[in-house]
Amino acid sequence: AIGGSINLVTKSTPYKRTFSATAGTGYNWVSEKAQLNLGLTYGDRFFNNKLGVMAAISYQNAPVGSDDVEFEYDVNKKGEVVMVEAQKRQYYVTRERQSYSLAFDYDINPNHRLTLQGIYNRRHDWENRYRVTYKDLDKTGLDDEGEMQQSAQIETKGGTPNNKNARLELQQTMDFSLGGEHQFGKLSMDWGASYARATEDRPNERYFNLKQDFLGFDVVDAGDRFPYVTTDVSLHNGKADGERGKWKVKELTESNQEIYENDLKFKVNFELPLTNGIYGNSLKFGAKYVSKTKDRDVICYDYADAYKDTYDTEYMNNLTSQIRDGFMPGSQYKATDFVSKEYLGSLNLANMEGEQVLEESSGNYHAKENVTSAFFRFDQNLGKKIKMMLGLRMEATHIKYNGWNWNVDENEDESLEPTGDHKNDYVNWLPSVLFKYDVNDDFKVRASFTETLSRPKYSALIPCVNINRSDNKLVMGNPDLTPTISYNFDLS
C-alpha cells in the first residue's frame, strides 16, 4: 500500500461568532535564538445560521539545535562486544511552519447538510550538521605493513546561498474535502469526496566530507553512555606526513530530491431501518474508491575528484570551529574545525564535472494504487438483550509500479536500468460477525469474528533489483506481493 493515512484536522464551524489571537515565544539554548508562535482564528454563522464559516492561520519560527553523540557496536570473533564507530555531531536547525485552514457548512434544511473543508500546511527546515566520525575502532594495533588501521572523517552538511547555506527540506500538505448528509424518508445517506497532496523537496543538498587514514585512537569508557576518543583529530594535522597521512576529499556531493503523493477519495454510505421493536433490524451499505500515486525522484552527483583537481586544499582557508562550549553530552567532546557552510554553499558546482551517484537514484519509483471497495452490514436485535451484526466487505486492488535496477559488478562498474511497469490485481472478501449480550446494566459480553488485511508497504512492492557484487549485497522488491490476511477472534 502507498503510505498510510494522515488526519489533518481543521477547526469545526462554530455555533456563534468566535475570535481568538495567540502569540508566544521561547528561547533555545543551543541556537541561542528566540522562537515565535502566532495564531489567529475567526468563525461566525450567516444567513439565519444556515451558513457556518471558520478560518484559522498560524505561524511558527523555531531556531533550534542539538548536541549529539552516537556509537556503533558489534560482536567480534571472540564473542566480545566492541565499539566499531563513534560520532559527535552538532546540529543547527531553523523550522518555519505556516498553516491555513477554512471550513464551511450549509444547512439546506433539517434533512440536508453540506460541508466543505480545506487545509494547507507549509514547513521549511533549514539544517546544518557538523559531524566527526571515528571509524574502525575495533581494529587496534598495526596491519601487516606496520600501519595503524583506524580513520577519521570530518563532514559539513549544508546547501546553497539561496537556501541560507543550509540543507532545505520543504514539506507541503494540502487536503480539500466536500461532503453531505441527507435524509430521504427512512433512508439516511452520507457522502464525501476529497483530494490530498503531500510533497517533499530537498534542493541542492550538499555534503563536504574529508577523510584521514592510518590513525590510532584510544577510547575511554567504551560501553558506557558517553564514551569518547581521547585522540583529537584536526584538519591542521597530517599535511606533512606525505600522501598516506594527509586529509583527502572523500565526498563533495549535491543532490536534488522530490517526493510527492496524490490521494483522491470518493465514498457513499446508506442506512435503512427495516423493522422496529425488540426484533428490529437495519441495513447499512456503501462503496468507496481510493486512488493514490506516489513518485520519488532523486539525482545526486559527486564532485570530489573535480574539486581536488581544481582547488586542491583551498578549503583550509575556509574553516569554522564547531562542537560548541557547553556541549551537553560533556566537556570531554572537544571543538573541531570544519569546512564552513558559507564556503560549501559558495562552490560553483555547475562549472565542475561531477559523477552521478547511481545508488542514490536506484530508489526512484512511480507507484499507482487504486482500491475499489463495497460493504453491507445487517444489524438484528434478537430480543431485548442480544444484538447480532453480520457484515461483508469487498476490496478490489489494482497496482502499477516501476523502478530501477542498480547493478555493481566485481570491478565496481555500475549500471542503472529501468524496470518497466509491473502490475498486480487482486480481490479480497472480508466477512465479520459480532454478537453483543447485555446481561444487565453493569455486565455486557461481546464475541466477534473478523477477517482483516494488511497490505505490503510501498517500498517492498517496487520492482527493483539492486545487486552489489563487490560487497555481496542484494536488495529486491516484489510487486506481486499480496496482503497479509488475519482471522481475528475476540471475546470481551
Give, region by region, the residue ranges found by the protein language model:
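Transmembrane beta-strands of outer-membrane beta-barrel proteins
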Residues: 17-21, 51-55, 114-116, 178, ...
